Regions:
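C-terminal motif of bacterial Sec signal peptides marking the signal peptidase cleavage site
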Residues: 12-16
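Cross-family detector of peptidyl-prolyl cis-trans isomerase
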Residues: 17-160
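Sec-dependent signal peptide recognition
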Residues: 1-10
Length: 160
């Protein structure tokens, strides 16, 4: 009887320590399809127009073309940005009068930025709607839930 009781206690402990059984495991392609559906729904529900998309699911709209000087991998970029979730909650922004500095192609920012910033020129502005696989994927943080589609408005201030 004690042995049976010990086994039951052990099983309860093991199952209570496991990950939430409500989590759904998706393949990358399934998640991308879901993200694209969310993005297209967001665009439609908000009556947005003028967006283009890439095969990787990145949707974008160039608001200002800039001066025809495009960034290349290895360039240092100064950008101003605002990031938000599809529900409109802002999770990050660059400081006023202090652009964010990054090196394009270095991997220090999410893939969606690495790809999207090559679509605008110096002094240009773009809106990027980034599927989770080009952002933080299944990783969550305090302000960004796992598998979140992210929206960024980015102005490329300077290329060095």
């Amino acid at each position: 009887m004690i042995r049976l009781f010990s086994i039951i206690i052990f099983l309860v402990i093991i199952t209570s320590c496991s990950e939430d059984s409500n989590n759904i495991v998706r393949t990358k392609q399934e998640q991308l399809n879901l993200d694209i559906s969310r993005i297209e729904g967001y665009i439609s529900e908000n009556n947005l127009s003028g967006y283009s998309s890439l095969d990787n699911g990145l949707h974008y709209k160039v608001l200002d073309e800039g001066n025809l000087t495009f960034p290349q991998n290895g360039d240092t970029l100064d950008v101003e940005y605002v990031g938000q979730l599809l529900n409109g909650i802002e999770f990050d922004r660059s400081y006023t009068n202090q652009p964010f500095e990054m090196i394009l192609g270095s991997g220090e920012v999410i893939q969606g930025w690495e790809i999207g910033l090559q679509l605008i020129d110096e002094t240009g502005t773009i809106i990027l709607i980034i599927p989770s696989g080009l952002a933080y994927g299944g990783t969550s943080s305090n302000s960004i839930p796992e598998n979140s589609v992210l929206i960024f408005r980015v102005k490329l201030i300077n290329i060095r």
